[in-house]
Amino acid sequence: MILLVDIGNSRIKWARLDGGKPADMGAVTRGKTGIKRVLSKAWKEFGDVNRVVVANVGGPKVAEQLEQWLQTHWQIAPEFLTARSNGYGIRNAYSKPETLGIDRWLGLVAVRQRYRGGDRKKAICIVDCGTAITLDVLAADGKHLGGLIIPGLAMMPKFLADHTAGINETTEAVEYSLLASTTSAAINAGALYGAVAFIDRVSHDVAVEMKGELKFVITGGDAPRILPLLRDKYEHLPDLVLRGLARVAKDTSKVRRETDLDCAAQ
């Protein structure tokens, strides 16, 4: 079995590769003290895993913990992916392509794979609403035009608590309203409407530049909160990064099989 793993800043998502697509998806919140205990509980029923293909934006410490866990339990090493200058019909906008977040690169890979035929005549705006909110644009010819990053809904209140006197991080239930009557609700609503305004304005400006030929895709844990307030019609793809992982894992599986056959023939 090939296991696809998407490690974010707050959650870990996974799926098995089935016919080139992600299947049997699961997710857990990352533990504050590490991920080994979380993985032992979440993956205890998995058997016959021979490859683990990983998109990690959670940092080197969590990567090291995953390596240790996989070696201890399954005696295999993870395959950490990085963004490329080009591939899968995409040309990376970054002069140092490997510095583009792997989650953003795989989002580009996934939408390029998903939209074919007539849909390929339009550019695609991809919004990922996670710990950070990212917006990337992929031209119809596969050229990545670049993107933007702002703090996500959970990060904005933390920033205010860290840098503003009189505002503390709250443990109250998250509340959203147009005009709030408590400080915590005002912060949460401000974060939400700020994110919506950012996405709407940037997507509008990009659409003008593209002369209206633009499709919209949204993903990430906070997408369900943001999506209802957006002006444009977005396709919600919660498993976008896993779709990109599946595409790359399928491609590299073919290369590995061909290499094994070549070695066997020698």
Swiss-Prot record:
Q: InterPro entries from the entry?
A: ATPase_NBD, Type_III_PanK
Principal EC category: transferase
Q: Which cofactor does it need?
A: NH4(+); K(+)
Q: Could you say which residues bind ATP here?
A: 6-13, 131
Of the GO CC terms on this record, one is: cytoplasm
Q: Which residues bind substrate?
A: 94, 101-104, 183
Entry's Gene Ontology molecular function annotations: ATP binding; metal ion binding; pantothenate kinase activity
Q: Where is the active site?
A: 103
Chain ranges passing through the membrane: none
Annotated catalysed reactions: (R)-pantothenate + ATP = (R)-4'-phosphopantothenate + ADP + H(+)
Report the main location listed first in the record. Answer: cytoplasm
NCBIfam families registered for this protein in UniProt: baf, PRK13328.1-2
- What this chain does, per the record? Catalyzes the phosphorylation of pantothenate (Pan), the first step in CoA biosynthesis.
**Name of the protein in question:** Type III pantothenate kinase
Q: Which organism is it from?
A: Nitrosococcus oceani (strain ATCC 19707 / BCRC 17464 / JCM 30415 / NCIMB 11848 / C-107)
User: Which gene produces this protein?
Assistant: coaX
